[in-house]
Amino acid sequence: MIYYRSLHNIDVATGQIGRKIIPADFNSFIEEYIRFATEENKSTKDYKVCDPNTTVVHCVESIVSQCESQGWLDLEMATLDSFANSIANKLLREEINAQESIVNLGKEIKRGSLVQALIGSNRENIQYIIAKVEHSEWYDGESLRKTFGFPSRSKNVWKSAVIPIKIDDEGTIEFGMIRVYTDNVAKYWAERFLELEEANSDESNTSRAFEAVELELKRSMKKHFRRDYYILRDSMLSTMKTRQLFNYDDVIGRIFTGYQPEEDGLTSKLQSIKQRLLKLPEKKNFDRQFNTAPEVLKKKRRLAFRIKDGIELRITGDETDFMDDITAYKDSVGKRYLQIRCIDQETFDVFSKRQ
């Protein structure tokens, strides 16, 4: 059930917000945005409230408190609207500041509108949704005034926050872990607008995610599909070695989609391995969306392979496609050899036999 909803146009260029009356036929749009934020979108990062007196948290708590005191029926909308307006104004201020910090880079904050909604089925299952959504602007052909609207087909959500709320028997309002989604690496949404504290740092997320994937691949593949294990492991490592916004589900999907195993017998097992990997964030306590911190994976870039007693092959640094440079073969009497592409002349000369 939707207890309360609001829609604001956020205009960074003019420094103004515009509150919009939501007509009945726009309810389906609001419901789709809510459904995306609460059910469909899995690429989120967990945050927690560190100060209940910050603008957004205080306003959300006040809206819920007003609904609770009014019995959740026949709500006094003017009071609720004033708190929603404060949240919209807070976003406007932070987007103006964010725009000023990137203007010299030739970039612009994505234009959009702010959707807010209070939903729930009982006092222990309440959620406040805040979402910045795509809108389009144009000039009216008759009045020549700028207006805006929403695309009927694509309903893009740029950023969102799902705030779970519980009310105990004494009327105390408690916030649960807040799920935040962003479409880029910008941190103003969570840190300066929502003013939340991340539950897991980017460093811990990066480390836990890679180690969890590495362990699952090792359990599932290393014994019988050793070459494929290293290929998939290095695909994951290669993706995480640069600082970027990392959507875990998307990355796993890209790595496995269309992958052609090197060894027989693996094809039929790939889907089940992929599904186990997709369950890891909850099992291993890392977020499905975070900014990668490549520096914590430096040791993971090092591999060692025993050749024979006294000889070891080491892979170091940022080399993640080493499998393309090393091939194995047997000679006519069954002796095993490794053939390594060498671009260093001095090393090559050491091992070159004179004709």
Residue map of PLM features:
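Long, hydrophobic alpha/beta structural blocks
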Residues: 1-302
